[in-house]
């Protein structure tokens, strides 16, 4: 995971006028970053922003609020968040919580590596600990499809000032001031909208 050892911006250093950047009626000005990094999504210049959803997501970025976007499958919920992050030059990581994602995928694992010609075991942090420690918008896609063991891990970071204990390293991680969490869901916790028997 050497790719995770990159320089990310430290503090927002640019003001963005919501009316001009997102083409919606608002006097709001939000903070973002001047420069784009490799973790910032590409801008889709043809994307049209829904006003209510955009303002809710911007509140998440500006005021460190946890925001969940609900809607039907394929309506662009995750893309909406990514396109806002793209325009704010905010590093963004999207994790799909399908049935294949595990605690180890999120938290990290021991890996064997060569050091001075010898094999050693070293813990490699997963995307969750890395994201928590950086100015990153973490998007949990299909939040309602997450496995229970994975959801217990995520529960620990839902509080805006919540510390995160990484048991594998006997380490307590403090959330970066600019770490943000978003989620998308199809069912708002109500289960499948249609069940075939």
Outline where the language-model segments fall.
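AAA+ P-loop NTPase catalytic core and its hallmark functional loops
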Residues: 2-195
């Amino acid at each position: 995971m050497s790719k995770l050892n990159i320089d990310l911006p430290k503090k927002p250093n640019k003001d963005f006028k919501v009316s001009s950047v997102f083409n919606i009626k608002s006097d709001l000005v939000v903070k973002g970053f001047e420069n784009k990094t490799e973790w910032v999504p590409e801008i889709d210049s043809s994307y049209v922003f829904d006003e209510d959803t955009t303002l809710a997501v911007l509140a998440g970025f500006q005021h460190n609020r946890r925001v969940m976007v609900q809607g039907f499958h394929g309506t662009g919920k995750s893309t909406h968040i990514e396109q806002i992050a793209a325009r704010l030059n905010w590093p963004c990581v999207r994790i799909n919580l399908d049935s294949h994602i595990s605690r180890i995928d999120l938290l990290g694992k021991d890996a064997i590596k060569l050091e001075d010609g010898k094999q050693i075991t070293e813990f490699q942090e997963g995307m969750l600990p890395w994201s928590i420690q950086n100015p990153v918008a973490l998007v949990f896609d299909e939040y309602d499809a997450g496995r229970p063991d994975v959801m217990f891990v995520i529960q620990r970071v839902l509080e805006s000032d919540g510390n995160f204990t990484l048991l594998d390293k006997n380490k307590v991680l403090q959330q970066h001031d600019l770490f943000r969490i978003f989620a998308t869901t199809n069912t708002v916790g109500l289960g499948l909208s249609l069940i075939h028997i």
